[in-house]
Amino acid sequence: ELVGLREEDVDTRQKQIRVFGKRAKERIVPIGEGLCELIEEYRKNKCKLLGEQVGIGTFLVRKKKNGEWQAMDAQTLYNIVRARMGEVSTLKKHSPHVLRHTFATAMLNNGADIRTIQSLLGHASLAATQVYTHATFEQMKEAYEAAHPRSRK
């Protein structure tokens, strides 16, 4: 999804990104002010670097060995994410997919509704979203104690 983003899909004024998922299914994902600022900084630097090639409509670009700029491919993005996660994460696996799992779990742990998470991830079925959300045992215990009538007996 990320490598397919085009410049017109990223709207920092509205604080949203238009994402095209599987089977070209479109969804709108909100983004925060901090990310908007980083995107605007990226765009300024991208314009300076691309120069005459500024017409490239792809949001993410990379420089080829011959000096030309082109759309970033999935493998390059994977390598970048893996390297950066290795620098800052204690997780064993480092990939964009792990970031999706982490995002979904963090949203759930901070009170987001599972249906909202489903929409943000672009899942057609709730079952697919549930695979991405990892509740801790403590959270399950708290929910059980709060909601089940016989939990305190």
Whereabouts are the PLM-identified features?
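ATP/adenylate-binding site constellation spanning eukaryotic-like Ser/Thr protein kinases
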Residues: 7, 32, 36, 101, ...
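DNA/chromatin major-groove-contacting recognition/catalytic segments
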Residues: 41, 135-153
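Short, basic (Lys/Arg/His-rich) helix/loop patches that form interaction surfaces
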Residues: 29, 78-119
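Short alpha-helical segment immediately N-terminal to, or the first helix within
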Residues: 5, 106-107, 120, 143
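Short, charged phosphate-coordinating catalytic segments
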Residues: 1-14
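C-terminal catalytic core of Y-nucleophile DNA break-rejoin enzymes
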Residues: 21-41, 55-80
